[in-house]
């Protein structure tokens, strides 16, 4: 009997092992039952007890707790044990093979995102990273929909805000390459509905090139020209180093500029993402003046770009075209009208063709009526520091400057297409097996060349180029800080913040001769909370992955 019981117990334990191997698939698989022999009756009770006991012990050793799908930290591409076989629809998805060499960078970057998310009180945030053209990490933290406890995931769709400007630039560049658009003709050549302008009694010309780099003098959301000029003067005064004590006039200017700064920063630093440090200094909220810019919250639907021009076309220019940088989303509304006239297509139709070419199949204009899968809700903090839904807005007046929805994956595709076009001309193509870029190398070089008299407000080391901010390579002292060349654009809208950053590889002869483009790191981050500065976070993440890539 002892020999028989030992045999049955061993068989039961052996059967139990694979069923409780630590994976969800194994945990739900029903184990096979032991085969009963003819002499079993005498020890039935004891035999079953020993068998079940062995099965329970092995199961408890191997079982892994299953995280609830509602856990907001549980979505995205994460590093899991090989035994954890997960269904495609589960909140965790196994890390792609390309990610396994970046485990340190992923862990470090995830920790950084948790810190940023907690610091600003953001409901949800999604990140994506690609290395040399391959997506190696994407993950969502927190909630896409707080009310229904829908977790963020890589497929979550959010407002990308001013990254829309970089998308519009591709349309302009394609038309320029095709000879259908002259960047230096007055805009009235394409859009006669936009009136000719004067500045201080002098007739001036607004061109497509000036619009792209925010040098046209067309206003942003702030309509008070005096406030804007005082703020610009105050900022210029603050940047002067080593000056003597201010005069009475300078003190007055500082006082005026400081007061106005509180008001005019709402649409720019608080909504357009231009002051990362200020955004981080306190929890984002509905502070005084945050919601006084009525045009940010328009509910009116505009049928086309020409109709949208009536919001600003008769307003005076704030500066002489070409003289000063004034960030303007309305300038891109005029650019959308130029795209329509130069292409012969409606702006959105032309953009959808571009998205199709770039394989950006989840990128669409934001509209309230259509059902858009995986669309997040958008949030802000009220005066009582309570999380609330943002008011309904209609962005049809500014598709080109801040009206698109997208995912981190689509933004990575876009970044890689731009990087490929930028680099492909530098690579040896002896077998002619490299395909042309979506944009020509000379076009990309033009787009990523800093423009004089501009500002890159999300990184003071850089300048604005053509719908991208660009920081150039620089090192002033030996064995000291080295500034890497990169291009990026941030975005800030009602209830949303975003960034797309491209860190090109510093190519050497070995890479040029033996490798293929794109070479570099792309980082995209989207968040369903307004006023969250993300550029420095994206740059830190890019540098973390660049370290692992170099090892």
Swiss-Prot record:
The keyword Repeat does not apply. Residues 69-101, 237-287 are annotated as: Disordered. Mitochondrial serine protease that acts as a regulator of mitochondrial lipid metabolism. Acts by decreasing protein levels of PISD, a mitochondrial enzyme that converts phosphatidylserine (PtdSer) to phosphatidylethanolamine (PtdEtn), thereby affecting mitochondrial lipid metabolism. It is unclear whether it acts directly by mediating proteolysis of PISD or by mediating proteolysis of another lipid metabolism protein. It is an enzyme of class 3 (hydrolase). The lineage of its organism: Eukaryota, Metazoa, Chordata, Craniata, Vertebrata. Its main location: mitochondrion. Its EC number is 3.4.-.-. Residues 248-279 have a biased composition (Basic and acidic residues). It comes from the Eukaryota. GO terms for cellular component: cytosol; mitochondrion. This is Serine beta-lactamase-like protein LACTB, mitochondrial. Expressed predominantly in liver. It comes from Mus musculus (Mouse). Keywords: Acetylation, Hydrolase, Lipid metabolism, Mitochondrion, Protease, Transit peptide, Tumor suppressor. One of its GO terms (biological process) is lipid metabolic process. The modification N6-acetyllysine is found at residues 301, 346. Belongs to the peptidase S12 family. The modification N6-succinyllysine is found at residues 287-288. Induction: Down-regulated in a number of cancer cells. It is found in: Mitochondrion. Residues 1-113 form a transit peptide. The active site is at residue 162. GO terms for molecular function: identical protein binding; peptidase activity.
């Amino acid at each position: 009997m002892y020999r028989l019981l030992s045999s049955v117990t061993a068989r039961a334990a052996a059967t139990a092992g694979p069923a409780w191997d630590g994976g969800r698939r194994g945990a739900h698989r029903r184990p096979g039952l032991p085969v009963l022999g003819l002499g079993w009756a005498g020890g039935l009770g004891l035999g079953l007890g020993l068998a079940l006991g062995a099965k329970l012990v092995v199961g408890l050793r191997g079982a892994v707790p299953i995280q609830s799908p509602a856990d907001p930290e549980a979505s995205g591409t994460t590093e899991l044990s090989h035994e954890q076989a997960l269904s495609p629809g589960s909140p965790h998805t196994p890390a792609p093979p390309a990610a396994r060499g970046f485990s340190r960078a992923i862990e470090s970057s995830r920790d950084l995102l948790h810190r940023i998310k907690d610091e600003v009180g953001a409901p949800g945030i999604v990140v994506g990273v690609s290395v040399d053209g391959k997506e190696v990490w994407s993950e969502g933290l927190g909630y896409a929909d707080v009310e229904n406890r829908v977790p963020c995931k890589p497929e979550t769709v959010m407002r990308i805000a001013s990254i829309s400007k970089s998308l519009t630039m591709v349309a302009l560049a394609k038309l320029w390459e095709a000879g259908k658009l002259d960047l230096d003709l007055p805009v009235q050549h394409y859009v006669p509905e936009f009136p000719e302008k004067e500045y201080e009694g002098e007739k001036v010309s607004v061109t497509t090139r000036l619009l792209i780099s925010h040098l046209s003098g067309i206003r942003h959301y702030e309509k008070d020209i005096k406030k804007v000029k005082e703020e610009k003067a105050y900022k210029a005064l603050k940047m002067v180093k080593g000056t003597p004590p201010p005069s009475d006039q300078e003190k007055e200017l500082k006082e005026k500029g400081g007061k106005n700064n509180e008001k005019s920063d709402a649409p720019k630093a608080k909504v357009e993402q231009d002051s990362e440090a200020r955004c981080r200094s306190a929890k984002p909220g509905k502070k005084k003046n945050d919601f006084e810019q009525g045009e940010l919250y328009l509910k009116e639907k505009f049928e086309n770009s020409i109709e949208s021009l009536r919001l600003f076309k008769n307003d005076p220019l704030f500066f002489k075209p070409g003289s000063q940088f004034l960030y303007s989303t309305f300038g891109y509304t005029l650019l959308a009208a130029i795209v329509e006239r130069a292409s012969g297509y409606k702006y959105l139709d032309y953009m959808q063709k571009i998205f199709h070419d770039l394989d950006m199949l989840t990128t669409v204009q934001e509209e309230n009526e259509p059902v858009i899968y995986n669309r997040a809700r958008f949030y802000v903090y009220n005066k009582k520091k309570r999380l609330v839904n943002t008011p309904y807005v209609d962005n049809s007046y500014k598709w080109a400057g801040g009206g698109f929805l997208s995912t981190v994956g689509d933004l990575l595709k876009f970044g890689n297409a731009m990087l490929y076009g930028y680099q492909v001309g530098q690579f040896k193509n002896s077998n002619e097996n490299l395909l042309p870029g979506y944009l020509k190398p000379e076009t990309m070089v033009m787009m990523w060349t800093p423009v004089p008299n501009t500002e890159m407000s999300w990184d003071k080391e850089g300048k604005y180029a053509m719908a991208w901010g660009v920081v150039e390579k620089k090192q002033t002292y030996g064995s000291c800080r080295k500034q890497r060349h990169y291009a990026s654009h941030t975005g800030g809208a009602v209830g949303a913040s975003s960034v797309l950053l491209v860190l090109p590889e510093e190519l050497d002869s070995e890479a040029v001769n033996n490798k293929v483009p794109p070479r570099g790191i792309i980082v995209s981050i989207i968040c369903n909370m307004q006023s969250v500065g993300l550029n420095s976070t994206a740059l830190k993440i890019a540098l973390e992955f660049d370290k692992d890539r170099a090892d």
